[in-house]
């Protein structure tokens, strides 16, 4: 091979290296989804979202009105609007539903029968609300680390999810602050539902 061809070969290799290092461009932006997070006071909404955002437990304060958190994942960013769950706040939930692309409903699986019935009624209302009924739902049975916690099967039966949510996109998962892997897996499943839902809409 002549010196000219060798020089051309080296120049071409230098060009390829330059393209790889300098012309790659920024990575594609992660998709963002706007979600609403609802559930009774004490269900653990704020604590779960703060944990996912790697915030200090000492900074967690129960939400009285609403708050918004950007929860980052490897393949998406979830902009979660968390609504307070007190009696005097729940009647205003529907005012904040517009623009949501998905729903997170958190329930206390170790709560009293009265609170569990209230949570069931609120979930039924959300599943049938005109602005939410077609959206993906992630239902989290929280506080699974407590002795009185009900299993996912018990929650599914009590909440009558099979007949009520038939034909809808929903996931029911157990969770607790002690099991972050399970919590992140639940949100990964939700992101898959969100991607599928947006693909169908497009």
UniProtKB/Swiss-Prot annotation:
GTP binds at residues 39-46, 82-86, 142-145. One of its GO terms (molecular function) is GTP binding. InterPro entries: ARL15, P-loop_NTPase, Small_GTPase_ARF/SAR. Keywords: GTP-binding, Nucleotide-binding. The keyword Repressor does not apply. PANTHER family: ADP-RIBOSYLATION FACTOR-LIKE PROTEIN 15 (PTHR46693:SF1). Belongs to the small GTPase superfamily. Arf family. This is ADP-ribosylation factor-like protein 15. The gene is ARL15.
């Amino acid at each position: 091979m002549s010196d000219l061809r060798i020089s051309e070969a080296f120049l071409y290799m230098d060009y390829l290296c330059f393209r790889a290092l300098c012309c790659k461009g920024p990575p594609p932006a992660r998709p963002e989804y706007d979600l609403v997070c609802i559930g009774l006071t004490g269900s653990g909404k704020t604590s779960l979202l703060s944990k996912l955002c790697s915030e200090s437990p000492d900074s967690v304060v129960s939400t009285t009105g609403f708050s918004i958190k950007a929860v980052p994942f490897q393949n998406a960013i979830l902009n979660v609007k968390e609504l307070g769950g007190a009696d005097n706040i729940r009647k205003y939930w529907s005012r904040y539903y517009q623009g949501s692309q998905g729903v997170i409903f958190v329930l206390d699986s170790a709560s009293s029968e009265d609170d569990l019935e209230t949570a069931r009624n609120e979930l039924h209302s959300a599943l049938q609300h005109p602005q939410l009924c077609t959206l993906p739902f992630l239902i989290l049975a929280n506080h699974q680390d407590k002795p009185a916690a009900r299993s996912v099967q018990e929650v599914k039966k009590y909440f009558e999810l099979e007949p009520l949510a038939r034909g809808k996109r929903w996931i029911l998962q157990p969770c607790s602050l002690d099991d972050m892997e399970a919590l992140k897996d639940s949100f990964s499943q939700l992101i898959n539902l969100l991607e599928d839902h947006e693909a169908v809409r497009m």
